[in-house]
Amino acid sequence: PTAVEHVLTRWEEIRGDDSFAGIVALRGTDEHTPMGTWMPEGVRAVTLWDLHEKMGFRGDTSLIHRTEILRRYPFDVAPGEKFVAESSVWFLIDESYNMLADNEILTICHYLPDGLTQNFASNAKRNPIGYWKHKRYCAARSTTLKSRARETSLFLVGCMLAHQKGAISMAPSKALAVLCYPVALVARYTIFR
């Protein structure tokens, strides 16, 4: 009930600091239960990439961005498609800005049985070009072998769904793409069937 007031108060901490794109807070099933983990202790300035990939945060966030920054990063939806992962824009913003970490639940929500989270595979099938482009970016940016392998496998799945030729040569690591290809092939015909 006090989310707007809370955001305005936290905003004062970063007003005028051009290194911040906005605030990253939590979503929860109620005011006391986050949809995932709490923010890591002691974190103030963070990128969304580091929050998830380096600090182990899992779950949904409430994002409040400066409007003038969002306008500079339009969503790159492929022709004929209707969706691209929001994180494709958030991760690009990360390259130039931090977010103020806020360990407060600002949004209360619940997953729908037919929502994006539950139907990520069918969404990737309907929007394969945007999917493989996003996963290629994530594979290139990943810093651990596990993360690079996961994202490379999903990039290859996206290429298969889009009938994109030359996927291995387009991968950030061709050697890893060759190793991940069998995994991607299995995923394509099981999870993404």
Model-derived regions, located:
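Structural register within alpha-helical repeat arrays
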Residues: R148-G158
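Catalytic core of nucleotide-sugar-dependent glycosyltransferases
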Residues: L106-L112, N119-K146
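Conserved donor NDP-sugar-binding/catalytic core segment of glycosyltransferases
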Residues: T2-T37
